[in-house]
Amino acid sequence: MKFLDQAKIYVRSGDGGNGVVAFRREKYIEFGGPDGGNGGRGGDIVFEAVENLNTLIDFRYTQHFRARKGGNGAGSDRTGAAAPPVVIKVPVGTQILDDDRETLLADLDAPGKRIVLLRGGDGGHGNAMFKTSTNRAPRRADPGWPGEERWVWLRLKLIADAGLVGLPNAGKSTFLSVASAARPKIADYPFTTLHPQLGVVRLSMTEEFVLADIPGLIEGAHDGAGLGDRFLGHVERCAALIHLIDGAAGDVVDAWRTIRGELEAYGGGLADKPELIVLNKMDAMTPHQIAGRRSALERASGCKVMVISAAAHQGVDAVLRETLRMIREQRQ
């Protein structure tokens, strides 16, 4: 399934039904009086977050949603039927933005959460509503009120407990595949992963968390370089970050600073999230190189650095345990 995390759609609620002009007509009743009923309400536009979706790809093919008009009134004071709502199902974590892509209208961040974005128009009054002591037989009925319409943007921010960040080819996809049942594409070239990947990490029957692999960032991503920073939005909801660094690539401190700079430039509190720095590919380094690069990273970051080999399954469990501890600390 293709991944799509942004979509623009048109929504319109239903018009209200028209009121009707009608008079009571029965045997032996010469002047029955007005009995025209009111129109029914138009259909609402409702958004609902559901668990079994993880992409907005459906909105690439269906971009217009219109609710039905309410039923017209009828004689004998019968009110028109209200039109059913149009329920638009979106993945959990979807934000609804105005056409300017800035104004947040709703944040559907929990399964089952619903929002009535547009209300259907009210039904018009039938002539029975206009009867007075001086106007016993009104011939006036109102049309239904029009519905509302607007263009909106849908933006998906995946719900994950921890985010996996790092430069391209740092080994993030390999780490995710080892840590969870996810099977992302893995290859020895930059930008193998083009879309965020989610995996559930199960440490025991009662201990698990969701890990998101964010496509590789490069210097200048916040200005659109590489894949840009659009996928950083998926990290905003994470409680902790695993910063994976390719230990065999050379200047590990420069690699760490590059990603830190992008997190700070993006904003949104990303730079303030708890960060676990992990030096990957220990199997491709000598013990002397491991000690030197680990020490340099710890001096630059002021944090403890863990060393692993995702490909050889070395040290991964310890990283996952520490990540779970950080998540629990943040969620309290």
UniProtKB/Swiss-Prot annotation:
Residue ranges the record marks as coiled coil: none
Listed GO CC annotations: cytoplasm
Binding site for GTP: 166-173, 191-195, 213-216, 280-283, 309-311
Keywords annotated in UniProt: Cytoplasm, GTP-binding, Hydrolase, Magnesium, Metal-binding, Nucleotide-binding
Residue intervals of the OBG-type G domain: 160-328
Chief location: cytoplasm
Binding-site residues for Mg(2+), renumbered to this chain: S173, T193
E.C. code: 3.6.5.-
GO molecular function: GTP binding; GTPase activity; magnesium ion binding
Subcellular location: Cytoplasm
Keyword Hydrolase among record annotations: yes
Cofactor(s) annotated in UniProt: Mg(2+)
GO biological process: ribosome biogenesis
Enzyme class: hydrolase
Domain Obg: start-end pairs: 1-159
Entry-linked PROSITE patterns: G_OBG (PS51710), GTP1_OBG (PS00905), OBG (PS51883)
Subunit structure: Monomer.
Protein purpose: An essential GTPase which binds GTP, GDP and possibly (p)ppGpp with moderate affinity, with high nucleotide exchange rates and a fairly low GTP hydrolysis rate. Plays a role in control of the cell cycle, stress response, ribosome biogenesis and in those bacteria that undergo differentiation, in morphogenesis control.
Protein family membership: Belongs to the TRAFAC class OBG-HflX-like GTPase superfamily. OBG GTPase family.
Protein name: GTPase Obg
Source species: Acidiphilium cryptum (strain JF-5)
